């Protein structure tokens, strides 16, 4: 603990948020006795690798969860302006690895005149996937299932604009793609799918020179999906795209496949989460907290741009889901060695869960 912050790996994503839920229950039991509502906890430790066993769990134990008001998800925090946020959904993901092979070993680059280079072959395959200038995926049928946002969802984006200048400054970029801003920028971020190269590996990448013709080239591709796209369908479409364009030799392995999820922003759980957030952070303002922000400025957004297995609970079990009741913040440095949360934010998150239990009781 240093300068009002707790530093620890996973403290923001997401061990701290897990403990806020447990300590909120502890606070209620110690202060009032019996809980105002029934609670069930699902602890799952594989989210960072795509939750490969969670579907098996929900199929086996889903009947025990059905009938609940909904699911309070694991994440949450404040934006760069210090505003708490409530989100009712996530994007999905189709993550694949493409592999091109040539010789059975790395060989001297002088042989490039007569030996095919898998790195160039991979570049050609990648180029076929996307029109970079238009920022549009070229896989046939990629956008077919994209569901347009409703009027309420669009209104929420209009009411809660992104902190564009802070985002650009923080990332060190002069402008967003196509110089987007305002509602167009927020809509692109949350309502449109993506097709992104996450990494490319081949040959020699160390210091200085090494004249090598690589035997293999690999690329990892990440497609973030929106309702009503399906991850397995997108994977099939990518494979078909490669085959139809003469890249049958390019191997493809699906590394992660999760569907998007969207709960109603005007549902009972979302509104209870919003009301309890406004009350909690409004109290911080009244108390003169240095970490407070006006309670009425709590952001309610349709979904986040990230991914989690929320669809297993919403689409398959019929449970509304919300996230946002957490202790994170814009400078938490998630996944970095100096990951941190503010002590005051941590206890505010505990208080938020306590109030939410009261709202649902």
Language-model segments: which ranges?
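Acidic/histidine-rich catalytic neighborhood of metal-dependent amide-processing enzymes
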Residues: 10-89
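Acidic, glycine-rich active-site loops and adjacent beta-strand->loop/helix elements
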Residues: 5, 39-51, 74-79, 102-105, ...
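Catalytic-core environment of secreted peptidases
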Residues: 1-12
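Zn-dependent metallopeptidase/amidohydrolase metal-coordination segment
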Residues: 99-101, 106, 122, 191, ...
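Short beta-strand/turn micro-motifs at beta-sheet edges
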Residues: 84-88, 206-211
């Amino acid at each position: 603990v240093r300068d009002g912050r707790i530093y620890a790996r996973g403290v923001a994503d997401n061990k701290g948020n897990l403990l806020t839920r447990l300590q909120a229950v502890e606070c209620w039991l110690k202060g009032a006795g019996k809980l105002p509502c029934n609670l069930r906890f699902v602890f799952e430790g594989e989210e960072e690798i795509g939750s490969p066993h969670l579907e098996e769990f929900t199929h086996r134990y889903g009947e025990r969860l059905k009938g609940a008001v909904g699911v309070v998800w694991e994440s949450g925090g404040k934006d760069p302006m210090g505003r708490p946020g409530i989100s009712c959904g996530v994007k999905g993901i189709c993550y694949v690895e493409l592999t091109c092979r040539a010789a059975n070993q790395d060989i001297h680059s002088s042989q490039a005149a007569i030996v095919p280079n898998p790195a160039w072959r991979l570049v050609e395959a990648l180029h076929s996937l996307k029109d970079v200038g238009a920022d549009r995926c070229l896989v046939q049928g990629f956008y077919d299932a994209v569901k347009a946002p409703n009027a309420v969802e669009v209104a929420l984006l209009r009411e809660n604009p992104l902190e564009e200048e802070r985002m650009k400054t923080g990332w060190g970029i002069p402008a967003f793609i196509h110089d987007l801003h305002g509602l167009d920028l927020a809509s692109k971020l949350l309502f449109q799918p993506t097709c992104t190269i996450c990494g490319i590996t081949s040959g020699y990448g160390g210091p200085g020179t090494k004249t090598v013709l690589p035997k293999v080239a690999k690329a990892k591709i990440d497609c973030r999906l929106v309702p009503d796209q399906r991850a397995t369908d997108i994977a099939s479409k990518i494979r078909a795209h490669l085959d139809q364009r003469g890249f049958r030799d390019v191997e493809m392995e699906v590394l992660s496949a999760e569907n998007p999820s969207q709960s109603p922003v005007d549902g009972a759980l979302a509104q209870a989460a919003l009301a309890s957030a406004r009350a909690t952070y409004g109290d911080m303002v009244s108390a003169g907290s240095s970490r407070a922000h006006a309670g009425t400025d709590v952001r309610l957004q349709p979904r986040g741009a990230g991914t989690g297995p929320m669809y297993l609970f919403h689409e398959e079990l019929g449970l509304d889901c919300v996230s946002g009741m957490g202790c994170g913040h814009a400078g938490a440095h998630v996944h970095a060695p100096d990951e941190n949360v503010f002590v005051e934010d941590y206890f505010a998150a505990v208080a938020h869960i306590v109030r939410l239990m009261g709202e649902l009781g």
